[in-house]
Amino acid sequence: MATRTQARGAVVELLYAFESGNEEIKKIASSMLEEKKIKNNQLAFALSLFNGVLEKINEIDALIEPHLKDWDFKRLGSMEKAILRLGAYEIGFTPTQNPIIINECIELGKLYAEPNTPKFLNAILDSLSKKLAQKPLI
């Protein structure tokens, strides 16, 4: 049985494919997750994250951008965008505790992205979580 960490990793892969231009990924997300042995509760969890990010993608991007400082969101790599979007969605729109979300995103960064990415993700998501702690979205 898959863990939530594995489910999040699969969601990042789906978001990466979507960001890379694969619009069809929305139609086959469920079957792709099942191929990765993500089933039952974790499948529902993963699909809720994936669909939630896509549903609120413009709002999520607008949440992330002010925390990038000297970076332009459009110039970020697709994997970095995928992880940031997942993290920002969970921080802003789910009841999961922020330290758990940030740690999961750091681990996903270690697994999927460049060596400096985990520090970058930590800084952005920590800044975002502090801002949203003052003015929550939910």
Curated annotation (Swiss-Prot):
SUPFAM superfamilies: NusB-like (SSF48013). GO terms for cellular component: cytosol. GO terms for biological process: DNA-templated transcription termination; transcription antitermination. Keywords: RNA-binding, Transcription, Transcription antitermination, Transcription regulation. Gene3D superfamilies: NusB-like (1.10.940.10). One of its GO terms (molecular function) is RNA binding. The keyword RNA-binding applies. The keyword RNA-binding applies. It holds the Pfam family NusB. HAMAP family: NusB. Belongs to the NusB family. Involved in transcription antitermination. Required for transcription of ribosomal RNA (rRNA) genes. Binds specifically to the boxA antiterminator sequence of the ribosomal RNA (rrn) operons. This is Transcription antitermination protein NusB. The lineage of its organism: Bacteria, Pseudomonadati, Campylobacterota, Epsilonproteobacteria, Campylobacterales.
